[in-house]
Every structure is written in C-alpha cells, then in structure tokens.
C-alpha cells in the first residue's frame, strides 16, 4: 500500500478578520470559521488522495479562544489518519493579534473525508508521521476512528425514529 508523509497533504491559508465577519459579540462568526475549516480540509484531503473527496463528517470542533477583528487567522490542515477510503484531516486554527504579535491556538477540528472514484469510495494512501505533533495525532487516530464508527451507528439508529411530518400541520 502506498504511503505519504503527512506534510505532503498540508494546506495553509491566512485570512484577516473584517467587520462583516463578526457576530454580535464582536468575535469571528462561528459559521464563517466552519466554512473556512471545511474548505482548507478539503484541499488537504484531495492533495493526499489525488481524488474527488466528500465531507463525511465534522467530528469535533473545539473553539478554544475568541477571534477578534484585530486578528489574522491561519488555518493549517493535513491528513493525520486514514482508513481504507476515509481520511481524517486535522485543522489547527491560529489567531494572531496583528497589533501585539501574540499568537494563540483559537480552535482545533477533526473532519473526515471519503475519497471517490466514479462515485464510489476509493482507497487512499496511508500516512507517515514525522514530527511530535504528527505522531501524537496519528497514534490517537484509531481511537477517534472507533468513536466515529460508534457515533455513525447511533446516528443511523436515530434517523430511523425521526419524524418527517410537517411541524406546521400537526
């Protein structure tokens, strides 16, 4: 099976926070952050697999510190764990106060993509960690994959009991 270094999938994007990006608390709107996370993660997944990829799940997003208008936001994404056709992408969000020069981890996210060929799941290369950060993410990946598998089963079970009736006609 083909293997690739995690760094080969790395995608980085830096943006500036503008007034129209802010919520009523004068911090970056969470939906804007999630859209950027999904976008940068999709690049890492496609770069790793060299195939069309679809977002299977946003597994966890932890908003650690607020992001303000004086900040720039750097998104770093790379594939940190793989299954047969799935890829777990880690996204690290770093905010930098452009006036003070202070940097901080503002958010982290694990997001799963599935590689497709002719509309069907297709195999992906395994990943090779090099740095301490990559080794930790890779080593803990199987635990997160198992948790996702259990959660997906529960979601399917829940979908069976959810109603499709129109709430306005009850």
Regions from the PLM with identified roles:
Residues 18-19, 64:
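Residue-level recognition of the GNAT/N-acetyltransferase active site
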Residues 7, 11, 68-69, 80-170:
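HotDog/MaoC-like acyl-thioester-processing domains
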């Amino acid at each position: 099976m083909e293997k690739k270094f995690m760094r080969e999938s790395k995608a980085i994007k830096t943006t500036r926070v503008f007034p129209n990006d802010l919520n009523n608390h004068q911090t970056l709107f969470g939906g804007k952050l999630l859209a950027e996370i999904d976008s940068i993660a999709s690049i890492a997944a496609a770069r790793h697999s060299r195939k069309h990829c679809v977002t299977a799940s946003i597994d966890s997003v932890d908003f650690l510190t607020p992001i303000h208008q004086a900040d720039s936001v750097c998104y770093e994404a790379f594939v940190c764990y793989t299954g047969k056709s799935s890829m777990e992408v880690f996204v690290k969000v770093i905010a930098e106060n452009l006036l003070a020069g202070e940097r901080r981890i503002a958010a982290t996210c694990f997001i799963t993509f599935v590689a497709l060929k002719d509309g069907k799941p297709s195999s992906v290369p395994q990943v090779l960690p090099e740095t301490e950060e990559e080794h930790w993410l890779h080593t803990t990946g199987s635990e997160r994959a198992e948790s996702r598998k259990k959660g997906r089963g529960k979601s399917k079970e829940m979908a069976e009991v959810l109603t499709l009736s129109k709430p306005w006609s009850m």
